[in-house]
Curated annotation (Swiss-Prot):
GO molecular function, one term: medium-chain fatty acid-CoA ligase activity
Record keyword ATP-binding present: no
GO BP terms, alphabetized: carnitine metabolic process; fatty acid metabolic process
Family designation: Belongs to the ATP-dependent AMP-binding enzyme family.
Keywords: Ligase
Name this protein carries in UniProt: Crotonobetaine/carnitine--CoA ligase
PANTHER family named among the record's database cross-references: ACYL-COA SYNTHETASE (PTHR43201), MEDIUM-CHAIN ACYL-COA LIGASE ACSF2, MITOCHONDRIAL (PTHR43201:SF5)
One Pfam match: AMP-binding
Name of encoding gene: caiC
Enzyme Commission identifier(s): 6.2.1.48
């Protein structure tokens, strides 16, 4: 079944410009408060100019172009400008340092980079010291250094015509993007995403939020992340809605931005909810137009209830990962919700819980969450140049092994337990890190928490807790362990405590556990 009508991204943007014209498509707010607005017509013209820019620099269909940018209009221009000429975007996490960025450049085979001044010295070093295929750099925001192979993105773009000059044949099966996974436990893998994937993601995520063309979807999620691209941007554009992209999350500014732009949809991760809750309460907290807050794992019931009551919102839970493109399990529009369930399988997907022998399990039994989709259409196509890794998670008939553990109930609601790699084996018992973190997070002095397993010669693994305290608080080991003993089984109580100023996180707010082991 062809869900998207054979429409690739170039056709999508030409149609959107025709249908919605002068309606606002994109609003970008920088950390300094600078706001840029573009109508659907203007945005399509900027995309065309950017496509022409890349063509003048020698980029052709199938070439890879890396983007190392924070949230900004140029990211959107490049994303779709590359797609229009059949080239492939390789977004790089803007928080990555030299070694990690060089590794992605090498493994993606990117020949051109678009970045900003703050990252340029790092790439100068990479060009001098690392073997890459990079032959040109475009800078988005500064006067040019006196250096060969470097251009001003804005100057070159503004010299281009607003109509597309190069339009090679495109197929919805063509690769549009290679997005490298966050690599919280190992080296990142390049997830191959097609034009079909992105078009489907737009329709699917718009359905999940019941988006209309009068909606305003605001996000602070990084543009180089699958959530921003497929849950937010593609959904908003596919529905003809307005997409508001804020450069960076600020707990002090976020709720005001929701109110200022009259957002009807936004998305939050647990870190955002916890930091919003420690902001001073305001009489205007519930003065907003939000219909849904898209939510991603993981939060205790106490935290969820307090957030929803204070801000007068409801959470729409969505579960997915880069490889699934969208939230393939989640709450459905107009359907009942059952906290702490992560929802039910969405349309075009099947979901099962399987045991260690890949056999389906009945309701109530814990196993691996597995999803069935169509590679290159409703789930990712493959890992770039890594067939062994692809075969490890993706079966020939489209079943994807997520590596997450969970269970389902008799009505088809699924419940997340933990990442398999986050299960601690302690003296014959399996302990979920997420379960412990949700309990410990309810302590009134604790702002942030992660637990990890560390080697133990007697019990296989011991449990160590890393906590960040609320400002001005102190917490003794005696008080911490007493709280744990009162709220969890004895075998789950951590053996060690470390109090830190912060925890290592990636761009999507996930703890980088390998940095703590």
């Amino acid at each position: 079944m062809d869900i998207i009508g054979g429409q690739h991204l170039r056709q999508m943007w030409d149609d959107l410009a025709d249908v919605y014209g002068h309606k606002t498509a994109l609003i970008c707010e920088s950390s300094g408060g600078v706001v840029n607005r573009y109508s659907y017509l203007e945005l399509n013209q900027e995309i065309n100019r950017t496509a022409n820019l890349f063509y003048t620099l020698g980029i052709r269909k199938g070439d890879k172009v890396a983007l190392h940018l924070d949230n900004c209009p140029e990211f959107i221009f490049c994303w779709f400008g590359l797609a229009k000429i059949g080239a492939i975007m390789v977004p790089i996490n803007a928080r990555l340092l030299r070694e990690e960025s060089a590794w992605i450049l090498q493994n993606s085979q990117a020949c051109l980079l678009v970045t900003s001044a703050q990252f340029y010295p790092m790439y100068q070093q990479i060009q001098q010291e690392d073997a890459t295929q990079l032959r040109h750099i475009c800078l988005t925001d500064v006067a040019l250094p006196a250096d060969d192979g470097v251009s001003s993105f804005t100057q070159l773009k503004n010299q281009q015509p607003a109509t597309l000059c190069y339009a090679p044949p495109l197929s919805t099966d063509d690769t549009a993007e290679i997005l490298f996974t966050s690599g919280t436990t190992s080296r990142p893998k390049g997830v191959v995403i097609t034009h079909y994937n992105l078009r489907f993601a737009g329709y699917y995520s718009a359905w999940q939020c019941a988006l209309r063309d009068d909606d305003v979807y605001l996000t602070v999620m990084p543009a180089f992340h699958i959530d921003c691209q497929c849950t937010a941007a593609m959904a908003a554009f596919s529905a003809g809605a307005t997409f508001v992209l804020v450069e960076k999350y600020s707990a002090r500014a976020f709720w005001g931005q929701v109110q200022k732009y009259r957002a009807t949809i936004t998305e939050c991760i647990p870190m955002m909810i916890r930091t919003l809750m420690v902001q001073p309460p305001s009489a205007n907290d519930q003065q907003h137009r939000l219909r849904e807050v898209m939510f991603y794992l993981n939060l205790s019931a106490q935290e969820k209830d307090a957030f929803c009551e204070r801000f007068g919102v409801r959470l729409l839970t969505s579960y997915g990962m880069t490889e699934t493109i969208v939230g393939i399990i989640g709450d459905r529009p107009g359907d009942k919700r059952r906290w702490p369930s992560i929802g039910r399988a969405g349309f075009c997907y099947e979901a099962e819980i399987r045991d260690d022998h890949n056999r389906p399990l009945p309701a109530g039994e814990i196993g691996e969450i597995c999803i069935k989709g169509v590679p290159g259409k409703t789930i990712f196509k493959e890992y770039f140049l890594n067939p062994k890794a692809t075969a490890k998670v993706l079966e020939a008939d489209g079943w994807l092994h997520t590596g997450d553990t969970g269970y389902r109930d008799e009505e088809g609601f699924f419940y997340f337990v933990d990442r398999r790699c986050n299960m601690i084996k302690r003296g014959g018992e399996n302990v979920s890190c997420v379960e412990l973190e949700n309990i410990i997070a309810t302590h009134p002095k604790i702002q942030d928490i992660v637990v990890v397993g560390i080697k133990d010669s007697i019990r296989d693994e011991a449990i160590k807790a890393f906590v960040v305290l609320n400002e001005g608080e102190t917490l003794s080991e005696e008080e911490f362990f007493r709280f744990c003993e009162q709220n969890m089984a004895k075998f789950k109580v951590p053996s060690y405590l470390e109090i830190r100023k912060d925890l290592p996180r990636n761009c999507s707010g996930k703890i980088i556990r390998k940095n703590l082991k």
